[in-house]
């Protein structure tokens, strides 16, 4: 009904995958995973609105893969029943979530890693995921934790250092190795083609979402592909030039 974009990102060599925003149609997701012989290493939600987490518990039960959200959205997830009532739909199954990501963490599967960028505004715990191919900092597990950053380091400076590949030696939270081609940004409901996420729902903030986009997402190269939570793909360059909310 709500037509959320669910992303399945697989490594064709290792057959490992990450699933982002399983809002519904879990059987269809499982069918695609079986068709491509993919093993889910992690399930990530960019935020916990019901259209992005409606299938979370069922997919976790079927795959046993760890579920990751930003802790600032946990309270919103705990009120799925109220979200469902507001939309006039059934309450989906829920689960206990105890594993959280934060700014600078990297979720890994196969030869790929997704850098967590905290982009509050649509919700307090909204995140975007910068996906690149490269060797991550450790050989075991699915999550590299970010090293604590100096208090004065700006988010933009940290992102630019990461993109240059000089964010330090192989430390938790870094993605090492050259990227192959432009990065891919799974943006959730923060940035859309020609628009931005709603800020009139619980926890929303127009100031925060504009800061998230301008200070963090627009620090990425123009050729970065943006996969939004709804609608068509776009690029950072296209939104920098054409998005009316960013002028």
List each model region and its residues.
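Conserved beta-strand hairpin/beta-sheet module of binuclear metal-dependent hydrolase folds
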Residues: 1-36, 128-132, 184-186
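Residue-level marker for buried hydrophobic side chains located in beta-strands
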Residues: 18, 44, 67, 184-186, ...
């Amino acid at each position: 009904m709500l037509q959320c974009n669910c992303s399945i990102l697989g490594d064709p060599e290792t057959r490992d995958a990450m699933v982002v925003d399983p809002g519904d149609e879990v059987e269809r997701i499982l069918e695609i995973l079986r068709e491509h012989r993919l093993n889910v290493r992690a399930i990530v939600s960019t935020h916990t609105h019901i259209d992005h987490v409606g299938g979370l518990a069922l997919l976790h039960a079927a795959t046993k893969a760890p579920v990751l959200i930003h802790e600032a959205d946990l309270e919103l997830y705990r009120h799925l029943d109220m979200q469902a009532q507001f939309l006039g739909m059934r309450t989906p199954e829920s689960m206990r979530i105890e594993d959280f990501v934060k700014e600078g963490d990297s979720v890994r599967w196969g030869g790929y890693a997704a850098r967590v960028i905290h982009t509050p505004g649509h919700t307090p715990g909204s995140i975007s995921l910068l996906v690149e191919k490269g060797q991550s900092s450790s050989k075991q597990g699915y999550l590299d934790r970010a090293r604590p950053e100096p208090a004065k380091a700006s988010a933009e400076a940290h992102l630019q250092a990461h993109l240059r590949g000089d964010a330090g030696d192989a430390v938790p939270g870094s993605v090492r190795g050259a990227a192959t081609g432009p990065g891919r940004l799974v943006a959730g409901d923060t940035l859309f083609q020609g628009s931005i996420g709603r800020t009139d729902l619980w926890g929303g903030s127009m100031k925060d979402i504009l800061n998230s986009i301008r200070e963090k997402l627009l620090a990425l190269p123009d050729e970065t592909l943006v996969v939004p939570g709804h609608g068509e793909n776009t690029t950072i360059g296209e939104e920098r030039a054409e998005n009316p909310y960013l002028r």
